[in-house]
């Protein structure tokens, strides 16, 4: 995913640790009050607050189209925000309990994991219309996209698998067993590897995107819940929920090379593409 960390100190709701950066604006979801806070990435000041659907749980953006996509778990919709005007320009009905958001900027496709209906909704970014609904396994919680090979990787939390979707045909091409309760997933375009955070087994599974097989399992700290990949230095940052520690994995050796404290609730790490 090629992300780097940025810490901001602003008066927003930090109870839902998810954010996305676009055009030096950072979009942070506020699950408790059904809004998205927009923060200036240079000054760290709050720009505006945008009302979205009920219980927003995740956010991602397409830098090619300047669109931000927010999954609203409480009303089974996706809110589409124009990052140029910071206004909602579309509300898209999807499956039950939408959670993860994956984007292929080359194809202008948005992939939504529906944890409550065990499906993935495929949205055409040019029309804001769902063009396909793909059945996957139990409780798909998160998703990431390998845009170079047009494949989509879905973490199925209660089946302990990753579904691999062919983006051209919208069909399942492989199902890969991973650890206990995979909760987040990230694509490393530098080495063609997929990294899966397994919350209950306290590990990260590494999948070879060429063979769709697990080639490594890395022990980390307790309850790994978020994956962040920095392609500039080939490092994988794994946030461990239980002890607020980030495990840093060297993508070349698959070894944990550092453990870093996250901090308290007054700070928040934002992914910045």
Predicted segment positions?
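Predominantly soluble domains enriched in secretory-pathway, periplasmic, or organellar proteins
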Residues: 1-273
């Amino acid at each position: 995913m090629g992300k780097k960390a940025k810490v901001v100190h602003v008066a927003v709701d930090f109870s839902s640790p998810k954010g996305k950066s676009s055009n030096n604006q950072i979009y942070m979801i506020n699950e408790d009050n059904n809004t998205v806070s927009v923060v200036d990435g240079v000054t760290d000041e709050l720009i505006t607050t945008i009302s979205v659907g009920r219980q927003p749980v995740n956010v991602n953006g397409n830098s090619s189209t300047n669109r931000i996509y927010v999954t609203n778990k409480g009303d089974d919709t996706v809110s589409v925000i124009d990052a140029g005007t910071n206004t909602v320009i579309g509300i898209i009905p999807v499956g039950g309990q939408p959670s993860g958001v994956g984007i292929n900027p080359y194809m202008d496709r948005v992939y939504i994991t529906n944890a409550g209906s065990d499906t993935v909704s495929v949205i055409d970014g040019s029309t804001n219309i769902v063009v396909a609904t793909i059945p996957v396994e139990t409780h798909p919680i998160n998703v990431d996209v390998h845009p170079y090979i047009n494949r989509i990787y879905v973490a199925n939390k209660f089946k302990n698998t990753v579904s691999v979707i062919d983006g051209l045909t919208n069909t399942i091409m492989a199902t890969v067993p991973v650890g206990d309760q995979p909760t987040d997933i990230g694509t490393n375009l530098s080495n063609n590897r997929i990294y899966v955070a397994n919350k209950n087994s306290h590990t990260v599974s590494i999948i070879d995107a060429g063979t769709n097989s697990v080639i490594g399992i890395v022990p980390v700290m307790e309850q790994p819940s978020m994956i962040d990949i920095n392609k500039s230095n080939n490092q994988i940052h794994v946030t461990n929920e239980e002890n607020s520690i980030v495990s840093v994995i060297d993508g070349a050796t698959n070894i944990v090379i550092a453990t870093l404290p996250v901090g308290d609730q007054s700070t928040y790490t934002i992914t910045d593409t």
